[in-house]
């Protein structure tokens, strides 16, 4: 193909498209040099610790984990003994209950590496050449710009997992957000109690209760598995987990699929001990001791996220995933998953600003555009929220706003407020009775927030303080959504100032939450009209042909969760396309095949490429004639290669449908067949009719808007539509375990004639005083929990208790290594109790 490109006419066309010049081979200009990261100066614990100390970042005195002891699974999980007998669970589990201990270490892979660039993260040069070839074969007006953008993306981006320097600099940046120009503030410091936050969340994240069949929050995790040996009746109510994801501490280097039994043993033991703390003479001290014994359940592995990073920032910006210990993830998910799975309520189907559960397909993006046009016609402000993303339409201008390093703005009290909302609105029956017991209320309100917010992380052999919440924990989305809700509520209170104004930016200091304006689209009405008027007359979703439009449809670039909207003449509605910047980056750099089990199959790499090219076409490549033509050619070519190998293409690809990086966005959409216009019709045709005025109100506080609730909270006039029983129940979750026991009488219902808190009797007023006292105890208990989960800063790097650190570039297994065992340690009370219980189980 090089000879074709270097013919005088073609060479001139290519150089003209790239806006470059050369006297030599055109491919020297067309194909950027492979990026090789610089040598990482912080790839050893000594260098990393010195760097962190220089920047006054908190390094914790290391804690050791008891060595693993092998025990019988049926003794540790007696209710699941039948699963062991039937081979559903392994016979032995390894739990940290030894009499010696080790210091954990975690060395993640960083690829590409300076010493070995390898093939991981390599750009798709073959597709780049195909784009160039079809540029020469066709006269697409936007072809030269597309080729230039893809080539520039290859030259300036790099897919990979960053570097130690990038990870450590990210930690510093997170700390800077939390403690810098706008130090973090708790909801109460901003002016919101947990109950007031719950009222706001009723508007911004409406929810449905769990299914009636879902077990209450009263059980240890292993009790959520109902096993009889009959597949027709067997049932597991455990939250869904990704089996191939990391198990976290204390099982470094293993996956969740490898350690399911171990996670159940530890989670059961932890929640059981927490329950016993409730009935002890000193519940606070007992709970603190439990947290100390299980300290590793609050320490996440600092995992570098694979992304398309900017080459120039390779050593400055690596996104960190706080890889939670499996038992911690399991317990938190038991609180959140049963509810969120039933609560896909968003602005397209409910009167709420929430975008949770939103899909741009099947008319989703058109519903958004309909709502936007309705507000433009009525000259009304519009706001939407999804996690740390806020979208505002005001004065014919569209604003896309992101919380700056959203997780860094979180405090334990933010998560406590979210837990309060979960318990009082979700895990509660219609009659006001709770679907949880004191143990789970304590875990949710007292322990859980301290385990994942302002907790600790492990990188190399360094145990470090984390600022804000760990990214990727089971409550990351929920906590971010709550913080965005606070920003929007304060925006309403301030009179809805223009997002580009000083008054709007002053909300940062008021809320303690940093944010930035990512996009401003002025004169949105004209942009929408132009998109409709200039929509393509030919090609996909226009005349019904199986060809791309010669000129792409003009996109309304909302940046709505990464999606834009283009108008389809055939459907007479807007359809989604991926934001152009994201699309170009996806074309330039494949993420590669990461599923190890599928990677071993013959034809695996070819299958991945087929799915990749079909996904590129479906998410918006179909609207770009050059990308669509090249991706279609590549997909068909790879299919032929599979057929030559004698593999049934359609059946083989069924397992690969979720292998695309857009699997979450394309849920329920097949990538196994070549894309046609009918494919686009099938995935974009609305499943139901939509009338913006027919959207039902939120399940709670019907008839209220976020603005009205905010105003009512500010003025103090808001009345809860539920009875005083609800009021008392709401307060119940504020209690520490000891207060639940000592002041249980404060939770009896109000008189049946009383409908509102304000109408309650003197008895209720007295009870409220007790509850306020309990709330003060809870505030201090959050601090106690954090103290139980960390130690004071160490003035020196770990030395003498671990072997010399391995070079992660040359070690046989650089991902995981254990340090030398420390001195003997006494058995903890938990270990002693577990041993007695298991011995009793054996005798029985």
UniProtKB/Swiss-Prot annotation:
Gene source species: Infectious pancreatic necrosis virus (strain Sp)
Entry's EC annotation: 2.7.7.48
Protein's name according to its UniProt entry: RNA-directed RNA polymerase
The keyword Nucleotidyltransferase is assigned to this record: yes
Keyword Transferase: yes
Its biological purpose: RNA-dependent RNA polymerase which is found both free and covalently attached to the genomic RNA. May also contain guanylyl and methyl transferase activities.
Annotated spans, Disordered: 820-844
Occurrences of domain RdRp catalytic (ranges): 384-588
Catalytic activity: RNA(n) + a ribonucleoside 5'-triphosphate = RNA(n+1) + diphosphate
Broad class of enzyme this protein falls into: transferase
Biased composition range(s): Basic residues: 833-844
